[in-house]
């Protein structure tokens, strides 16, 4: 499992897949060190009240920073990502989670 709380790890993964951020898609990835701190994302999920019996739909998982934490708690996670370039990135970063399904979709349509 990748440590997605490390900005350099995220940059390496993005670079390996040839992905850059797209302002046209309004992409805002969680890369602020204060937010992706190893203790903050688990706390966000804890505060959400997600349990092992819950299914979660995540819209715009980005590179999967929060998705990993949700997958550790939820029974099933369906992550809907608009940007086709991020699908292989998510397959890479979420490969250790068999309870995550990534779907390339535009939820606004």
Where are these regions (language model features)?
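Catalytic cores of RNA-modifying enzymes
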Residues: 1-109
């Amino acid at each position: 499992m990748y440590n997605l709380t490390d900005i350099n790890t995220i940059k390496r993964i993005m670079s390996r897949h040839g992905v850059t951020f797209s302002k046209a898609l309004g992409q805002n990835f969680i890369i602020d060190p204060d937010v992706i701190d190893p203790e903050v994302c688990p706390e966000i999920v804890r505060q959400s009240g997600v349990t092992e019996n819950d299914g979660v739909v995540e819209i715009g998982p980005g590179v999967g920073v929060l998705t990993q934490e949700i997958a550790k708690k939820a029974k099933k996670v369906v992550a809907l990502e608009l940007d086709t370039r991020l699908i292989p990135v998510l397959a890479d970063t979420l490969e250790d989670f068999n309870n995550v399904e990534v779907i390339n979709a535009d939820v606004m349509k």
